[in-house]
Amino acid sequence: MRIMGLDVGSKTVGVAISDPLGFTAQGLEIIPIDEEKNSFGFERLSELVKQYQVDKFVVGLPKNMNNTSGPRVEASQAYGKKIEDLFHIPVVYQDERLTTVQAERMLIEQADISRGKRKKVIDKLAAQLILQNYLDRTF
């Protein structure tokens, strides 16, 4: 069973995949998207779904710190609905509060990566953290 984790932003989607047993998450890539042009990266996502034989999606929900939902939560849920309809694969949602902050801190403190390079990997690492949190909670 392979699970794909997604960190959906307004310009990119970070992608992570679980190992076949569902114990660990590995960051894969960042897919560029453009919400204004209705370009959501589904072609590339389709290739990854086939390549990894994905059984489930975990989409991060960027709730506010007071547990309320804002426009980004609605956008993530809309993205989840679209991929569920497109791929006929179940989608679950994982609270992703502070995962991007955690990812950035990891890149600064542990990897000493420059700001420019962090921007290129932050969403992939956030997707990995979202998926790993889900795996840790579920399995």
UniProtKB/Swiss-Prot annotation:
According to its UniProt entry, the protein's GO biological process terms are:
rRNA 5'-end processing
Give the keywords, sorted.
Cytoplasm, Hydrolase, Nuclease, Ribosome biogenesis
Q: Name one Pfam family in it.
A: RuvX
Q: Which GO terms describe its cellular component?
A: cytosol
InterPro entries to which the protein is assigned, alphabetical: RNaseH-like_sf, YqgF, YqgF/RNaseH-like_dom, YqgF/RNaseH-like_dom_sf
KW Oxidoreductase (keyword) present: no
Subcellular localization, as worded in the UniProt entry = Cytoplasm
Enzyme Commission code(s) on record: 3.1.-.-
Question: What's one GO MF term for it?
Answer: nuclease activity
Asked if the Swiss-Prot or TrEMBL record annotates the protein with the keyword Hydrolase, the reply is yes
Q: What is its main location?
A: cytoplasm
What is the annotated role of this protein in its UniProt record? Answer: Could be a nuclease involved in processing of the 5'-end of pre-16S rRNA.
Family, similarity comment: Belongs to the YqgF nuclease family.
Protein name per its UniProtKB record: Putative pre-16S rRNA nuclease
- The species this protein belongs to is Streptococcus uberis (strain ATCC BAA-854 / 0140J)
